[in-house]
Amino acid sequence: MNKTLLIDGANLVYRTWWIAKQANRDDGPMSGLHIYFTLNAINSYVKMFKPTRAIIVWDDKQEYEQNERKLEHTEYKANREYNPEPHMNNDTIRKMVEWLGTTNFFPRQLEGDDCIAFLCDHLAGFKVIVSGDGDFLQLVDQSISLYDPVRKRHTELSNFSDRADCEKKDFLFIKCIQGDKSD
């Protein structure tokens, strides 16, 4: 059976950048550490889930492109500050993962999260999403699971209520009522 690993690229590089920053005790350059931790994380996911295919979905837009949601709703993610530092090694990381046989996927004007949802809908076989973003819980079903690398938790339909504190059928309704504090 086909199994596709879908990795949230922005979430991954941001998390591994913070790990590299904590490990860099002498305040020297940490590009090598960041690249190492990122590639090591990807390798550990491939070993853990043994996919037939791995795809890293990135949030990057070209300079002339804008996010469709921000064009429609100027307040979208207005409370978030963008820190370019965690993304300084993206080009090197992307080249290296391609050499290792992983596909880089660039959504252009869309959010990487939306593209992961699209890929989950359109790819055959089982999909494992790797991200610390809890919004992906809404995608979990009989052919999609979510692995949170921060908490080291794997959520499937069978343990969904333990992770989300509600039944799967109620999850979207509860999310709509609560809203998203980070946005």
Features from the language model and the residues they span:
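Noncatalytic, basic helical substrate-engagement surface that gates or grips nucleic-acid strands
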Residues: N2-V130, F136-L146, V150-R153
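Feature 3881 marks metal-assisted phosphotransfer/nuclease machinery
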Residues: H154-D183
